[in-house]
Amino acid sequence: MLLSARGVARRFGSRVALEPTDVSLAGGEVVALVGPNGAGKSTLLAILAGSLEPSEGIVERPARVGWVPQRAAHYGRLTALENLRLFAALERVPPTRADELAADFELPADTRASSLSVGNRQRLDVALALLAAPQVLLLDEPTSSLDPAQRERVWHIARAVAESGGAVLVATHHWEELEGLADRTLELVDGRLT
């Protein structure tokens, strides 16, 4: 397993956002995580990514995890290219990788991220998640603001990560988008995997 979570749960005060949950991701697979708004999908992904501590349970993850949260993962006052170069430096990735991703995603080089369209900001966040060649890619509603061509591109990237031996977990409301892509589906309802 590339990623394993055992008994992870999360409470915010007295509110239970995520019941004790077990999740594992194997290399070579794309897994869809579906459920309604407020089901706990974003909470689970944040725990798996390591940006939110579980109230209980344990997560074993590889060193390189790429994560696209629902909320922006970039700095609005920097340009797309500056964001990519900053995160490349933090991840000890050659700056040429940042330049390649900016070109691959057709991101405007001189426009502040805060001035980009919602779709371009989403593409920037996907590019940031790919900087360090992640072994696990966690995507939280990554295509909600993308046009069909860009949406298809993100799904192609997800499949490429899996085909190279990585694992991908995609949270979405629209499981039909992932029918041809996902190897299996997990459903989360009221903080419980069903």
Language model features: what each stretch is:
Residues 3, 18-20:
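Conserved structural motif at the start of ABC-family nucleotide-binding domains
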Residues 34-36:
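The feature captures the beta-strand-to-loop junction immediately N-terminal to the Walker
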Residues 49:
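Helix-to-loop junction immediately C-terminal to a conserved catalytic motif
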Residues 137-141:
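Catalytic Walker B motif of ABC-type/P-loop ATPase nucleotide-binding domains
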Residues 148-150:
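Helix N-cap at the start of a conserved alpha-helix in ABC-type nucleotide-binding domains
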Residues 166-171:
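Conserved H-loop
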